[in-house]
Amino acid sequence: MHNSTDKSVKERFLDLLSEQFNTKEALATEIINLESILELPKGTEHFVSDLHGEFHSFQHVLRNGSGNVRSKINDIFQDTLTRKEINEFSALVYYPEEKLQLIKNSFSSKSELNEWYITTINRLIKLITYASSKYTRTKLRKSLPENYVFIVEELLYKSNKYNNKHSYYETLIKQIIELEQSDDLIIGLSFTVQHLVVNHLHVVGDIYDRGPEPDKIMETLIDYPSVDIQWGNHDVLWIGAYAGSKVCLANLLRICARYDNLDIIEDAYGINLRPLLTLADKYYDGSNPAFRPKNAEGLSELELEQITKLHQAIAIIQFKLEAPIIKRRPAFEMEERLVLEKIDYDKNEATLYGKTYPLEHTCFQTVDPNDPNKLTDEEADVIDKLLLSVQQSEKLKRHMTFLMQKGKLYLPYNGNLLIHGCIPVDEQGEMESMVIDGVKCYGRDLLDHFEEYVRIAFDHKDIQDDLATDLVWYLWTGKYSSLFGKRAMTTFERYFIKDKTAHKETKNPYYYLREDVDMCKKMLKDFGLDPEQGHIINGHTPVKEIDGEDPIKADGKMIVIDGGFSKAYQSTTGIAGYTLLYNSFGMQLVAHQHFNSKKHVLLNGADELSIRRVVDKELQRKKIRDTNTGHEIQAQIDILKELMHDRFVN
């Protein structure tokens, strides 16, 4: 009975498929096409990490493909163009709209401009021909400017072998110029180049954090042709807030206040902060130095005071909201983080981890020493209103939905493991376990459980105190969280305790064990990957190149690409971070210098890149056959061959 049911489902599937391929010839053509695609070189993967809301730096790296665009331009034009001309042409491909205006303004006559148009269009066609050489015509067509597909294809595939079409091709370009379509075409062709040099983008976590424009990054990613995301700790914080976690919401508001990024909340996402400001004005002092925003440049004294008050108000709400979760979830092992219960309010000191510290810069105006974790009625009302406003933001809904659709905690892809934070291990390198809903989880299984509960929380935004919603917050701050990767988050200590030893956050042993080849191979094997061929691509921790730290660890098994975009880390890293390229020939690590500005690139055309380092070179050029996409295509071929045998051979 079971077999006949299986067969009937299979038969129905083959029936549906045969409607699409209703002749032997149509089926054979598709099989030939797919088999041929498997033999093409694999496309270039581009890995970026820890964008931290820095839209302009991210956009530049995206537009130049971590130097890939410039590399292609050099390959073709290094013998025919000067360095200055290559710089000008590169800037045009990166920022076509703005560069076009600068160039047009530099010409004194229309005839000179028209000559430039002809030269530039021909150069772009030449560049696209080279950049698309490993793609099918169908794939290339999808990348071409929509309104000019016919014209561009004629120019791309032109053949004047018998000298019959010379004037035809000349007229095509002349008519483009005469009908004032040149600008649109050049802009479209430039974006085509950008999309061709990178086949797929991996964002290895933390789109959000202290930078001012994560919303613009999200809009860019939504429009990007092929992308996946591995959630970072800050991304999960925003997902949690939208999914109904008040404590996640309090945390992200506190971070925005700390770095003077409240514009993200109010202007970008339309969330009303007025109730919180009213509460803050009523209870808090605007001169508390511990709560002054880190980025105070350009703020008036009144604005500084307002943010300082708001910062205190939301921090206290956060500490109060953490307590009930810690108490109802003993498996989280976070009793030491019941910080408001650790305070002697008469002596103004706190006892944490067995040591007593004097407190400074305190702001406990709304804390009842007899019931320190209880929200006042005003605080409860404020956080309820804020959550409602967050969940009613259409823009935030769209961005968080995209994060869920394209995002995962980790991703095995083309033989490599992509993960933002860590795989929690103990000092001996054994996977650390955590009990979730009565089930002991560790390693890959632990991460799978975390992700499952994030999705449950997101699907049930109206429930705010279930295990799923609590676990989203745990991912932000818990000691067995793959995203946090430390034993405790010492936020309270950083605000109120002068002794810096209390601020220390001990990292999971993963962060020093990842230097070990055998450890990395073990992790790859645990995630179902070939330990000899695979790599772990890791974000989350800035690489302190200034102190001699190497982003390539464990004989190339571990590659750390974090620190690239957050300006706050650049003084400690010595660079503006790393991105990674993986094409059919192997992997290259790209180190980026500080991104000055778009204006600097437009005027000078110079990239803020340093020399690429080869991480791993393929002994044989990798084909699509060897990739995740190739395995999917092979599965399609197998089904089509079965249909051929079932319907046309017998």
From Swiss-Prot:
* One protein family per Pfam: FBPase_2
User: Which BP terms from GO are recorded?
Assistant: gluconeogenesis
Which pathway does this chain act in? Carbohydrate biosynthesis; gluconeogenesis
User: Domain of life, per the record?
Assistant: Bacteria
- The identity of this protein, by name, is Fructose-1,6-bisphosphatase class 3
Sorted alphabetically, the keyword list is: Carbohydrate metabolism, Hydrolase, Manganese
Organism per entry: Staphylococcus xylosus
**What broad class of enzyme is this?**
hydrolase
GN (gene name): fbp
User: Reaction catalysed?
Assistant: beta-D-fructose 1,6-bisphosphate + H2O = beta-D-fructose 6-phosphate + phosphate
> Which Enzyme Commission number(s) are listed?
3.1.3.11
An example of a GO molecular function for this protein is: fructose 1,6-bisphosphate 1-phosphatase activity
